[in-house]
Amino acid sequence: MLDPNLLRNEPDAVAEKLARRGFKLDVDKLGALEERRKVLQVKTENLQAERNSRSKSIGQAKARGEDIESLRLEVNKLGEELDAAKAELDALQAEIRDIALTIPNLPADEVPVGKDENDNVEVSRWGTPREFDFEVRDHVTLGEMHSGLDFAAAVKLTGSRFVVMKGQIARMHRALSQFMLDLHTEQHGYSENYVPYLVNQDTLYGTGQLPKFAGDLFHTRPLEEEADTSNYALIPTAEVPLTNLVRGEIIDEDDLPIKMTAHTPCFRSEAGSYGRDTRGLIRMHQFDKVEMVQIVRPEDSMAALEEMTGHAEKVLQLLGLPYRKIILCTGDMGFGACKTYDLEVWIPAQNTYREISSCSNVWDFQARRMQARCRSKSDKKTRLVHTLNGSGLAVGRTLVAVMENYQQADGRIEVPEVLRPYMNGLEYIG
């Protein structure tokens, strides 16, 4: 959520920045609502003051032995008017808040202006895509060769965009997540967390999934007698529960940064992606991801973004997977991000780079929703923290990249050296 004072005092400047990311802010409507809010605020305060004054007069008149019935009726009438004014003010403030919850974050000044993914800017590349002297197989073919990917079984169990992994392919999938967690906790300074996969509405509002992206979530549908659980949803990313761990907290600045990681399944309806990536593991309703989250002082967030992106890059480098780093343009950034780097890994069968990590600085956008603050020992005043999140990495897509980049002419898959300790020294699948 944006700073309400910024919306009130600099609406045109806010509108101009939002226009860079293709969002039209209705300045006139917000201005009219704000003017009405001011009028109601003054009216409410005046009625409250008048009611307090009249109530005091009742006591004074009673002490003098005077008739207080007319004063009592007047105070009652003022009370009714005050209640009505408060109700109108509350409704108006709720309307303003509802609008504010649909407004995306402002882009950082250095973010390239653009409409969509075609306007993203490549920053760097690492590694050289391998030249194969045989016909490249995609991960689906390789998975079926080794009886490791069973999409038909998943359709029987659930439906499309799910998979059953088996044998050494399933083991490599597990090895990848363990390798990522060990790297982030042992070398990058993150603490490992195990979090709920179901979260409530407040949690989803805190990180910005609600109200705008309710259609992207899988919501629980409880029995009537269990209606208290009706507001749960499956997490679309571990960013949601991890970031909300600081919701409503005031953190000692000496304890910052807080760096957290978690390996979880992620659940997404993939609304709007019908017909895209229908083959294989690239776009699933359920997929695993190792997530990184940082809670930092405001002045440290841009440096933290560079650090976090480097942590995701390190995973790819140790796995020996060629990738490129891009900065997303204003029109392609996520709702809450002010600046985002994507890492795209080389997928040989598609002869292109595909997203495998997205690392974002969210500034105080989520912190304002969550009321997550920090305070230094020398200053009693609190301020909002900055939050960052990043994939470190998407496990399924990393599995795809390893299978395809490490395939052999005979269909075997070489196990990257860094994964072998997690696979009992296995050098090849097949």
Swiss-Prot record:
One of its GO terms (cellular component) is cytoplasm. It is found in: Cytoplasm. It catalyses: tRNA(Ser) + L-serine + ATP = L-seryl-tRNA(Ser) + AMP + diphosphate + H(+); tRNA(Sec) + L-serine + ATP = L-seryl-tRNA(Sec) + AMP + diphosphate + H(+). One of its GO terms (biological process) is seryl-tRNA aminoacylation. Pathway: Aminoacyl-tRNA biosynthesis; selenocysteinyl-tRNA(Sec) biosynthesis; L-seryl-tRNA(Sec) from L-serine and tRNA(Sec): step 1/1. InterPro entries: aa-tRNA-synt_IIb (IPR002314), aa-tRNA-synth_II (IPR006195), aa-tRNA-synth_II/BPL/LPL (IPR045864), Ser-tRNA-ligase_type_1 (IPR002317), Ser-tRNA-synth_1_N (IPR015866), SerRS_1_N_sf (IPR042103), SerRS_core (IPR033729), tRNA-bd_arm (IPR010978). Its main location: cytoplasm. It is an enzyme of class 6 (ligase). Keywords: Aminoacyl-tRNA synthetase, ATP-binding, Cytoplasm, Ligase, Nucleotide-binding, Protein biosynthesis. SUPFAM superfamilies: Class II aaRS and biotin synthetases (SSF55681), tRNA-binding arm (SSF46589). ATP binds at residues 268-270, 355-358. It comes from the Bacteria. The keyword Nucleotide-binding applies. One of its GO terms (molecular function) is ATP binding. CDD domains: SerRS_core. Belongs to the class-II aminoacyl-tRNA synthetase family. Type-1 seryl-tRNA synthetase subfamily. Consists of two distinct domains, a catalytic core and a N-terminal extension that is involved in tRNA binding. PANTHER family: SERINE--TRNA LIGASE, SERYL-TRNA SYNTHETASE. Catalyzes the attachment of serine to tRNA(Ser). Is also able to aminoacylate tRNA(Sec) with serine, to form the misacylated tRNA L-seryl-tRNA(Sec), which will be further converted into selenocysteinyl-tRNA(Sec). NCBIfam families: serS. This is Serine--tRNA ligase.
